[in-house]
Amino acid sequence: MARILITSALPYINGVKHLGNLAGSMLPADVYARFQRARGNDTLYICATDEHGTPAELAAAAAGQDVAEYCAEQHVLQHDVGRAFGLSWDHFGRSSSPQNHRLTQHFCEVLEERGLIEERVDQMVYSIDDARFLPDRYIEGTCPHCGFDKARGDQCDNCGNLLDPTELKDPYSVISGSRNLEVRDTRHLYLLQTKMADKIRAWIDSHPDWQLLAKSIAYKHLDEGLIDRGITRDLAWGIPVTKGEFPRPGFEDKVFYVWFDAPIEYIAATQEWADEGAGRDWKSWWRTDEGADDVRYVQFMGKDNVAFHTVSFPATILGSQEPWKSVDMLKAFNWLNWYGGKFSTSNKRGVFMDAALEILPPDFWRWYLTSNAPESSDTAFTWEQFASAVNRDLADVLGNFVNRILKFTEGKFDGVIPDGGAPGPLEEKLYADVSARLADLTEQMDAVEVRKSAQALRALWVVGNEYLQEAAPWTAIKTDRDRAAVIVRTALNLAALYARISAPFIPFAAEKIGEAFQLPWPPVWPTTDAAAELSSLPVGLSVRAPEVLFKKIEDEQIAEWTRRFGGAE
């Protein structure tokens, strides 16, 4: 039994996430976690809300709430909507937890002992009208690299370049809109990433199996030359900067930079998980001197998070010289776009997770987002493509097959798996086809190829329809009941198999199919011995057709949703 540690990029606390956030980290991580559990592997899927930094303060101010109260409320909302989508986190933590406070402060102290932290007098943007220093995300302006006029002070969302606020052209305060800004001296701590460049490059070189997207972003930053990164900010909300047990002199009004503490929350959230359950040991997942050397660690994230996870967080982990588990596979995703533009939390552009569930069940969204996962390139969402994927794949292929064979069994065999007859050449051909396709599906799932996995799964659904059409039990029943029994028995086993292999992608519908066959749940991943798998249900078992699994999306609904959410504007 393997041990699989899975983390997905922490969603910001500033509101319910849109479908782009879901598609690029949490959903594919969930699919992978469900697959690994089904294979019997010891699997731990960790996520958390990212609660520090400017987004939290700005969102709380806009909501008229205290920031701590706002974060607590939003954490519950994000947890609940994630669960409603079927996200099977083993723990969904909070970066504001006491565990993350202690661990972040610990890393800073250890890094300083290793000569990788330095106090510097920095020049920061100060807003005269707001009477305060402006952290990165309190400043927007024009990107010096691509000319995008809404670049943030830490990163340009258009070209992806990491920025320093002083690099922005024509900057202004996000708080007041004031351009009455000046640069003043302030003291901050810096992580000396320049000292770690060779070690980070060697570490990335040691992972030749990483996808091109992740490696190309990492090497781009290394080739351009790493910069030392400020890890403290002039903010009130965040993790206090300490020296030993006390506030660090001169840093009493400062906190750690959100991108320093947020990845550390992966470890801290595992501590939270362990603290909440007897017999749980977080160190065996994260400390290689305590058993984590046999863990396979897989991270999921959007491409805009890759730089921080391949440079800054490794600089923290490797620089500490402590035996922490580092990532084995980093799975990055391109962007799911909204009609050619971006989904946007701040601009409320696109469909958000809570609104999505108001109009359709979660499996509809899960299937579309995985079968169209933005892996090799950006993917554009359109209502027409969404409806086509749901109607074609779920309703016409999977739903049609399950409904046809169960209804036929109810009508011709009293809803009982029939005895009689023996498999013939058509079944032998089916066994070979299903075995090969199961092997392909398992291989793609193991490789974390989300889109290819969905394609392999759909191909297996198609096989069932083709078999049923060719075998034609409705014809065989008229002259050869034993032959009809073989076909029905085989097809019912195939439908039960579909429940098991579809569960990582569409868990709610898969469970309904499983209930029709009284399958134990959660399911076990099948072997590639199709002959055995397609004869595993006991003869005489009562089966029943579920309610309509997938109701087709109509043109009128598309028109309504386009009016409500927007579309091809």
Curated annotation (Swiss-Prot):
Any one GO biological process: methionyl-tRNA aminoacylation
Cofactor: record remark: Binds 1 zinc ion per subunit.
Catalyzed chemical reaction(s): tRNA(Met) + L-methionine + ATP = L-methionyl-tRNA(Met) + AMP + diphosphate
Any matching Pfam family: tRNA-synt_1g
GO MF annotations in UniProt: ATP binding; metal ion binding; methionine-tRNA ligase activity
GO CC terms: aminoacyl-tRNA synthetase multienzyme complex; cytosol
HAMAP family on file: Met_tRNA_synth_type1
Official protein name in the record: Methionine--tRNA ligase
Lineage, highest ranks first: Bacteria, Pseudomonadati, Pseudomonadota, Alphaproteobacteria, Caulobacterales
Gene that specifies this protein: metG
